[in-house]
């Protein structure tokens, strides 16, 4: 795993899960995904979540991001208990505090790269001018300054994913949640996008929580947690 230490100047968890439980029901059949799961992600920390297919990695990420609700336990984001917030307040907290990157970029096809990255800033209530300046700066940071006015269909797979990284950072979030963000890319492009995320983590002190099946990428992060039998266990360097 990465030998750089977790930043000491930034204290306190940006995300905390306490005794988290999640059960799905299908007719009379109950499927328990988590039971009593605990997790803390500190500010500026990078965390990989690994585990077998079907273990619930994506479900956990959705719970941490307030996109789904737990059956038991609580999730706190920036110190706020998600279950105590209205849908509107939860959405505003997500937009301000969290960024999301998925395996597929989810860029809106009818808008340019610049417009896609501007949207979270506009939704936060900032002016068009501010949103444009922020989006342009981020797209230049991910080496897409020459592709601002291109729509997703005019970008390569790697370029689309880099635009998605820029969009995730649009509101300077405390934490970015990534669900296999490089899983749909070839090895070379995946490595480029991953290194970009780490560079932005170092520059902006944004925490990263990445679900990945790639143990090589996981080793580059501060901690590697394995989702196993409904809970999380931290892996040693030898186990990764």
Swiss-Prot record:
Alphabetized UniProt keyword annotations: ATP-binding, Cell inner membrane, Cell membrane, Membrane, Nucleotide-binding, Translocase, Transport
Gene3D superfamilies (alphabetical): P-loop containing nucleotide triphosphate hydrolases (3.40.50.300)
Entry-linked Pfam families: ABC_tran
Subcellular location: Cell inner membrane
Protein task: Part of the ABC transporter complex LolCDE involved in the translocation of mature outer membrane-directed lipoproteins, from the inner membrane to the periplasmic chaperone, LolA. Responsible for the formation of the LolA-lipoprotein complex in an ATP-dependent manner.
Family the UniProt entry places it in: Belongs to the ABC transporter superfamily. Lipoprotein translocase (TC 3.A.1.125) family.
Protein name: Lipoprotein-releasing system ATP-binding protein LolD
Taxonomic lineage of the native organism: Bacteria, Pseudomonadati, Pseudomonadota, Gammaproteobacteria, Lysobacterales
């Amino acid at each position: 795993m990465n030998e750089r230490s977790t930043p000491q100047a930034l204290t306190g968890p940006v995300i905390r899960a306490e005794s988290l439980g999640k059960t799905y029901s299908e007719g009379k059949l109950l499927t328990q995904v988590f039971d009593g799961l605990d997790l803390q992600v500190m500010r500026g920390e990078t965390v990989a979540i690994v585990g077998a297919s079907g273990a619930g990695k994506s479900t956990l990420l959705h719970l941490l991001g307030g996109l789904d609700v737990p059956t038991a336990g609580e999730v706190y984001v920036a110190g706020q208990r998600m279950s105590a917030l209205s849908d509107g307040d939860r959405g505003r907290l997500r937009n301000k505090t969290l960024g999301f990157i998925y395996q597929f970029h989810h860029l809106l096809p009818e808008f340019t790269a610049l417009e896609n990255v501007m949207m979270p800033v506009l939704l936060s209530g900032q002016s068009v001018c501010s949103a444009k300046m922020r989006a342009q700066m981020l797209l230049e940071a991910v080496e897409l300054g020459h592709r601002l006015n291109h729509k997703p269909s005019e970008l390569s797979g790697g370029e689309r994913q880099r635009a998605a990284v820029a969009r995730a950072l649009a509101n300077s979030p405390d934490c970015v949640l990534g669900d296999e963000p490089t899983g749909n890319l070839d090895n070379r492009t995946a490595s480029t996008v991953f290194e970009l995320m780490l560079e932005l983590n170092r520059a902006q002190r944004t925490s990263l929580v990445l679900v990945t099946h790639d143990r090589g990428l996981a080793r580059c992060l501060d901690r590697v947690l394995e989702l196993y039998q409904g809970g999380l266990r931290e892996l040693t360097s030898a186990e990764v």
